């Protein structure tokens, strides 16, 4: 059975709102999770990382004020330390994050979102 699309978002994030609108317009079902209230678990983060092509750099919000304030050197951290940090400070994650059983999309990217829509059975729940 195919895993439903999980959409990690933050309501005041413009990219998240655009992505949500795009998903609804294309009738793609998704399970929305508030990134800061329902932080991804360690296992979910490991799975998300396994779908990246650039590793942690792909999901880390290096331009965020949180990242700048922490003055981190990610290269010196272990994977476990990075995972713990992301669970503790989810504002370090780029958003939105969309993940299903084989595909990951970070940010509002209509071209990448279109790839999701092509592999999903498109139907809207009432």
Swiss-Prot record:
Effect of residue 37 to E: Destabilizes MgsR approximately by half. Strong decrease in activity
Localization of this protein: Cytoplasm
UniProt keyword annotations, A-Z: Activator, Cytoplasm, Disulfide bond, Redox-active center, Repressor, Stress response, Transcription, Transcription regulation
Activity regulation: Activity is controlled at multiple levels. Regulation includes a positive autoregulatory loop on mgsR transcription and a post-translational redox-sensitive activation step by an intramolecular disulfide bond formation in response to ethanol stress. In addition, protein stability is strictly controlled by rapid proteolytic degradation by the ClpXP and ClpCP proteases. The McsB protein-arginine kinase might serve as a proteolytic adapter for the ClpX ATPase in the degradation mechanism of MgsR.
Chief location category: cytoplasm
Induction: Expression is sigma B-dependent. Induced by ethanol, heat and salt stress. Positively autoregulated.
Pfam families the UniProt entry points to: ArsC
Disulphide-bridged cysteine pairs: 13-16
A GO CC term assigned to this protein in UniProt: cytoplasm
Signal peptide: none
Family: Belongs to the ArsC family.
PANTHER family registered for this protein in UniProt: ARSENATE REDUCTASE, GLOBAL TRANSCRIPTIONAL REGULATOR SPX
Main function: Regulates transcription of a subregulon within the general stress response. Exerts positive and negative effects in response to ethanol stress.
NCBIfam families for this protein: arsC_related (TIGR01617), PRK01655.1 (NF002459)
Name of the protein described by the UniProt record: Regulatory protein MgsR
């Amino acid at each position: 059975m195919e895993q439903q699309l999980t959409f990690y978002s933050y309501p005041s994030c413009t990219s998240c709102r655009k992505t949500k609108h795009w998903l609804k317009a294309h009738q793609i079902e998704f399970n929305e999770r508030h990134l800061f209230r329902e932080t991804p678990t360690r296992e979910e983060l490991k799975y998300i990382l396994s779908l990246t092509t650039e590793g942690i750099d792909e999901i880390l919000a290096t331009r965020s004020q949180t990242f700048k304030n922490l003055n981190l050197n990610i290269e010196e951290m272990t994977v476990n330390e990075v995972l713990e940090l992301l669970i503790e400070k989810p504002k370090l994650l780029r958003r939105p994050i969309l993940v299903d059983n084989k595909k990951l999309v970070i940010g509002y990217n209509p071209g990448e979102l279109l790839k999701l829509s092509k592999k999903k059975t498109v139907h809207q729940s009432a």
